[in-house]
């Protein structure tokens, strides 16, 4: 899996620095959504210490290359990062109690049905489509 991400870096003439490779390995190993401080903790625990500035700069590079997804929680002003896999459609549900994301995949047909109800089908090109919902998971 790392090889495909490294290939994108090489194709874009980016150096394969130790911090950049360590960040990719971290995101591969921890395939959930994480904020900047959580990523730093993962790297520190893996004996790959890095500064927050270096992590942030590398995340920006990975985002520009469309290797990661970014979600900003407007209520907390918190940014979350997740490694991007194959293009596919999702609803992301952020559980307020557990402070974590759950992913619900959608088919193109389901997305088109959602868009048709809002008369947006002619305006949207489906490459990736994300719906982010916030709430609480009730297991009753």
Curated annotation (Swiss-Prot):
GO terms for molecular function: DNA-binding transcription factor activity; transcription cis-regulatory region binding; zinc ion binding. Pfam families: FUR. It comes from the Bacteria. InterPro entries: FUR, WH-like_DNA-bd_sf, WH_DNA-bd_sf. GO terms for biological process: negative regulation of DNA-templated transcription; regulation of secondary metabolite biosynthetic process. This is Uncharacterized protein MG236.
